[in-house]
Amino acid sequence: MKELFGRDYQFALSTAKNNIPSSRYVDTYFDGESFYVVTHMLSQKAVEVSDNPNVSLCCQKMHAFSGRAKIIGHPLNPKIAEIRSALTKAFAPWYFKHNNEADENMCYIRIDPTAGFFHKDGIGYKMDFTKKTVKAFPFTFDTVLIE
């Protein structure tokens, strides 16, 4: 997964409030066993994650994950310095242009996947992150993408 998603990778992030879903595209970075998103505490996604941590990620290449999200804090918090370093490198072309670390409401969201599907080199992988199992099978991505 690090090979595919351990870089700036765009997903649609879905959250929900009062059983009403909301989706938006976000830049993510996968590190360790989690996806990370840079955002603002007052954004709709952060507010919804605070109330309901159940989220999903998907992209047009059919990679999809469900999991639990948590706001892990402000980027200048020393406890998350290691992930900040990784995020500033992964998002180098735009990180400091679009984020203000002097803003006390800037934050990172960590998404710990519980289940997911991705494919690479003709193999599909169905993952259960909770049970730490993976099922591999032949897979051809033959969806015609329409812009």
Each language-model region and where it sits:
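Short, basic, glycine/proline-bearing loop/turn elements
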Residues: 10-11, 23, 27-34
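Hydrophobic residues embedded in beta-strands of well-ordered beta-sheets
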Residues: 21, 35-36, 116
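Short secondary-structure boundary/capping segments within folded domains
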Residues: 2-5, 17-20, 27-29, 47-48
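A short, Trp-centered hydrophobic/proline-enriched beta-strand micro-motif
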Residues: 3-18, 55-58
